[in-house]
Curated annotation (Swiss-Prot):
Subunit structure: Fourteen ClpP subunits assemble into 2 heptameric rings which stack back to back to give a disk-like structure with a central cavity, resembling the structure of eukaryotic proteasomes.
SUPFAM superfamilies, sorted: ClpP/crotonase
Protein name: ATP-dependent Clp protease proteolytic subunit
Family: Belongs to the peptidase S14 family.
Length: 195
């Protein structure tokens, strides 16, 4: 069942114009990442980021995150695009940023990473499941360990935490309040109202 997407009506000098809510928000350079991070979702987010860069490479983009995480490769596609494009991307956690969602929250431009006061943030090591021959299982296990090291290294860079702290904390699910995420370095400020 697909979710109901609200339509907003806007008055222009040419009359009324109807937009779905996400298209209207995109006009204000707001991108919404909600739900599981899949390849399809990553493609949509990447396309919106690239579009907004083409529209105005000097104006900030606002990425609102409410996600339990998802595919590591899909998350890396979004992360790399955030780093690649010229505009600063401000990240804002509303609700939850867990796993790859928390990773992307930390990916925002330094000084422009926020969470609302009742947000929850969770980091952990990547999860993988593979079946097959012993050799294939070994190959996948070695690969996921490399991914784990890459995620930990980037989290250490983005948060300012020593790699040893990141390795310890991501060994299991590590939950944080917005205030704790601020102290940890995942975000730069807890915000209650727009400035």
């Amino acid at each position: 069942m697909s979710a109901l997407v609200p339509i907003v009506i806007e008055q222009t000098n040419r009359g009324e114009r109807a937009y779905d809510i996400y298209s209207r928000l995109l006009k204000d350079r707001i991108v919404i990442l909600s739900g599981e991070i899949t390849d399809d979702i990553a493609s949509l987010i990447v396309a919106q980021l690239l579009f907004l860069e083409a529209e105005d490479p000097d104006k900030d983009i606002y990425l609102y995150i409410n996600s339990p995480g998802g595919s590591v490769t899909a998350g890396f596609a979004i992360y790399d695009t955030i780093q690649y494009i010229k505009p600063d991307v401000s990240t804002i956690c509303v609700g939850m940023a867990a796993s790859m969602g928390a990773f992307l929250l930390a990916a925002g431009a330094k000084g422009k990473r926020f969470a609302l006061p009742n947000s929850e943030i969770m980091i952990h090591q990547p999860i993988g499941g593979v079946r097959g021959q012993a050799t294939d299982i070994k190959i996948h296990a070695e690969w996921i360990l490399k991914i784990k090291q890459r995620i930990n290294r980037i989290l250490a860079e983005r948060t300012g935490q020593p790699i040893e702290v990141i390795e310890r904390d991501t060994e299991r699910d590590f939950f944080m309040t917005a205030e704790e995420a601020l102290k940890y370095g995942i975000i730069d400020k807890v915000i209650e109202r727009r400035p």
